[in-house]
């Protein structure tokens, strides 16, 4: 089972091109990402622990934060949205920028925690 397909829709080339209209501030390009899930529950999915190394992309536009893993859009959140502050962004590791999402805080059919650790220098990303 592809866990990413349960977390979001496919992020194709057309979607990426559409972001250029929003004014891309930062684009990590295709980088390695460590994906972790803890107690992930929802319709058609249950995983107590999962850790996977994939390729992904982190994009910051003027108005949105987009996190892509395995070709699927995991996070697409306006920067001014009240739930944006519920994302935990950890920049303590000099080789990774980690985004933690508690899915129970978001209006969806899923619960649990996911961690997206992008293998980039956290200094590159300014939110």
Annotate the PLM regions.
Residues 1-57:
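Anionic N-terminal interaction surfaces
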Residues 4, 8, 110-127:
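Terminal and domain-flanking low-complexity segments
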Residues 13, 21-22, 28, 65, ...:
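Low-complexity, intrinsically disordered short peptide segments enriched in small/polar/basic residues
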Residues 39-113:
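Phosphoinositide-binding peripheral membrane targeting modules
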């Amino acid at each position: 089972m592809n866990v990413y397909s349960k977390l979001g829709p496919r992020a194709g080339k057309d979607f990426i091109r559409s972001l250029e209209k929003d004014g891309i501030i930062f684009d990590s390009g295709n980088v390695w990402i460590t994906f972790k899930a803890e107690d992930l529950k929802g319709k058609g999915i249950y995983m107590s622990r999962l850790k996977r190394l994939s390729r992904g992309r982190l994009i910051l536009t003027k108005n949105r934060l987009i996190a892509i893993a395995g070709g699927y859009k995991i996070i697409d959140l306006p920067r001014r949205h009240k739930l944006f502050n519920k994302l935990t962004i950890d920049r303590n590791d000099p080789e990774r920028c980690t985004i933690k999402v508690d899915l129970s805080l978001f209006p969806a059919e899923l619960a649990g925690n996911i961690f997206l650790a992008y293998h980039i220098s956290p200094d590159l990303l300014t939110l």
